[in-house]
């Protein structure tokens, strides 16, 4: 079959290092340190190239550098250009597990090859517990296919049911399937996709990226830690860093709330966030309904180093008796039991023994304006709680299968039977090795000039901002700030949630009712990463983010937006 591969040239802005990729895949670097026009020579394919005769029907298992039984490819299909995506070729495939017992599932993956390719590839991460192939056309990251990326991703080796239903749960007790979710599927999918890309374009990508959010953010950190030779740049939003403990954390709260006296009800939400605002809003220099100085606020409410300290003393009910448990106002009081629960939620949780990479604590949550979010507060009594009816429902949440299946080995188990340091301790350590992206040594990734951009929000109640901050601090402690600043940024956006969106609170720290508006948080993380990787344009420690006609500096940890002289600028403590 006659191949239709032609060169496409684009000349972009000045860069520090120029690479020329010709039609034979040769790479010619400009002299390092010089400034020259960036010249990217890509390739095109047409519908005639989108065929099994070109990309094949299988990939040898030896090509995949994690254990697999084989890789099969479905017949490619060509999608013509539309308003939402350029013309591209789609190849679906399946990576067979080594374990054929039934619990381990095939990893279903997809590769999208744009008609006009700029020698870039990006692996897109998943979300939640995975189970579906992510949207590969571009989504919120600016239509990646239009930017000349070949895109690829997988379901990580298990399959959800219709809609958001979890599907079969037998995979949750299979070690190969769990390790696939944790890390192996990333390498397996990468290696299979590279084989497809090379067959289609007759060369491998010049630049290789990983972009992910939430579970995908954790996966981004994972590839930088485990497979640093495969990627030039990683963008990881709101990563679920300590995944094994994040799944357990809601159960730790429910275990704390088994005694009815410890139950924090939804009626207390306004009192909780009102106290956060009262103590923390003005720590950045301005009472405006936004807690910008997140680290100082965290220090006030984290009692892990001094359990006798009580940041909630001003909210304690007189004589430990709540005169009106149904009071939903900011003036509502808290009992000693409720205060004990809040101390748990907003302090570092200490493990019985250190987990993978010597991690001794889980950061839990930061003071926020959504204290009932993501199951931190539940509305009804649950099975196992004092006074709950026998028919009360078992507490459940997005990651509960990771507790009952991964940890306890029985998806029907009661997660509230967990005891820290108890009979599941060895399994806890094993899962931490497979699932937690906590290795602070990124020296191999850095030595290859890899670039890492992480963005988090302090109002996140799905992922743990505390764990995210503690991980990045461990990288700084291990490698030194000067070295880390050469290749990584952790951008922290105060008071935005898991989707990096949020508003100021309607009552400021001085008790005044104020207008509510969006917090600036919009920025193009992919372009920021491309500029750093391909053009040597290092992002500043402060990047302007927007929301409509509003703008703010987005600060790189450990800086925060401080108000002085009529405006905000990034400052450190």
Positions of predicted regions on the chain:
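Short glycine-enriched nucleophile-adjacent loop
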Residues: 217-228
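Catalytic-loop region of hydrolases
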Residues: 26-120, 133-139, 287-291, 300-412, ...
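Conserved alpha/beta-hydrolase "acid-adjacent" motif
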Residues: 462-466
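Cap/lid segment of the alpha/beta-hydrolase catalytic domain
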Residues: 128-202, 248-249, 410-434, 496-516
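Bacterial N-terminal signal peptides
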Residues: 9-22
């Amino acid at each position: 079959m006659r191949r239709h591969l032609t060169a496409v040239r684009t000349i972009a802005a000045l860069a520090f290092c120029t690479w020329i990729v010709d039609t034979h895949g040769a790479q010619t670097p400009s002299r390092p340190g010089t400034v020259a026009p960036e010249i990217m020579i890509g390739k095109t394919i047409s519908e005639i190239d989108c065929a099994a005769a070109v990309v094949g029907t299988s990939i040898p298992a030896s090509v995949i550098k994690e254990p697999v039984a084989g890789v099969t490819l479905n017949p490619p299909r060509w999608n013509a250009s539309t308003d939402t995506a350029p013309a591209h070729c789609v190849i679906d495939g399946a990576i067979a597990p080594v374990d054929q017992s039934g619990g381990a599932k095939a990893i279903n993956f997809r590769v999208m090859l744009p008609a006009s390719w700029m020698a870039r590839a990006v692996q897109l991460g998943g979300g939640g517990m995975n189970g579906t192939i992510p949207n590969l056309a571009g989504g919120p990251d600016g239509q990646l296919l239009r930017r000349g990326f070949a895109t690829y991703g997988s379901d990580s080796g298990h399959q959800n049911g219709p809609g958001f239903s979890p599907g079969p749960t037998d995979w949750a007790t299979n070690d190969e399937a769990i390790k696939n979710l944790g890390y192996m599927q990333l390498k397996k999918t990468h290696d299979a996709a590279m084989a497809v890309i090379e067959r289609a374009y007759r060369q491998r990508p010049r630049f290789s990226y990983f972009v992910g959010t939430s579970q995908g953010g954790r996966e981004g950190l994972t590839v930088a830690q485990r497979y640093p030779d495969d990627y030039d740049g990683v963008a990881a939003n709101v990563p679920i860093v300590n995944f094994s403990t994040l799944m357990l954390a809601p159960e730790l709260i429910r275990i704390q709330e088994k005694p009815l006296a410890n139950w924090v009800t939804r009626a207390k939400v306004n009192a909780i966030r009102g106290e956060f605002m009262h103590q923390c809003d003005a720590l950045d220099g301005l009472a405006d309904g936004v807690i910008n100085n997140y680290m100082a606020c965290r220090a006030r409410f984290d009692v892990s180093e001094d359990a006798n300290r009580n940041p909630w003393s001003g909210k304690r009910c007189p004589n430990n008796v709540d005169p009106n448990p149904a009071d939903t106002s900011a003036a509502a009081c808290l009992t000693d039991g409720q205060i004990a629960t809040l101390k748990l939620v907003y302090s570092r949780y200490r493990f019985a023994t250190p987990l993978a990479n010597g991690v001794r604590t889980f950061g839990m949550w930061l003071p926020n304006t959504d204290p009932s979010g993501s199951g931190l507060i539940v509305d009804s009594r649950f099975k196992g709680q004092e006074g709950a009816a026998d028919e009360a429902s078992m507490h459940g949440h997005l990651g509960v299968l990771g507790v009952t299946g991964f940890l306890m080995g029985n998806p029907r188990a009661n997660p509230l039977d967990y005891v820290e340091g108890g009979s599941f301790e060895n399994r806890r350590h094993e899962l931490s090795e497979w699932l937690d992206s906590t290795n602070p040594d990124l020296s191999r990734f850095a030595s290859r000039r890899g670039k890492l951009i992480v963005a988090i929000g302090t109002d996140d109640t799905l992922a743990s901002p505390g764990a995210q901050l503690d991980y990045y601090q461990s990288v700084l402690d291990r490698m030194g700030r000067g070295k880390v600043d050469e290749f990584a940024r952790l951008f922290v956006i105060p008071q935005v949630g898991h989707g990096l969106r949020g508003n100021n609170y309607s009552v400021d720290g001085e008790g005044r009712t104020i207008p509510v508006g969006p917090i600036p948080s919009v920025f193009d993380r992919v372009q920021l990463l491309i500029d750093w990787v391909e053009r040597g344009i290092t992002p500043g420690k402060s990047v302007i983010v927007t929301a409509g006609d509003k703008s703010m500096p987005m600060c790189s940890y450990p800086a925060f937006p401080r108000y002085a002289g009529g405006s905000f600028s990034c400052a450190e403590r």
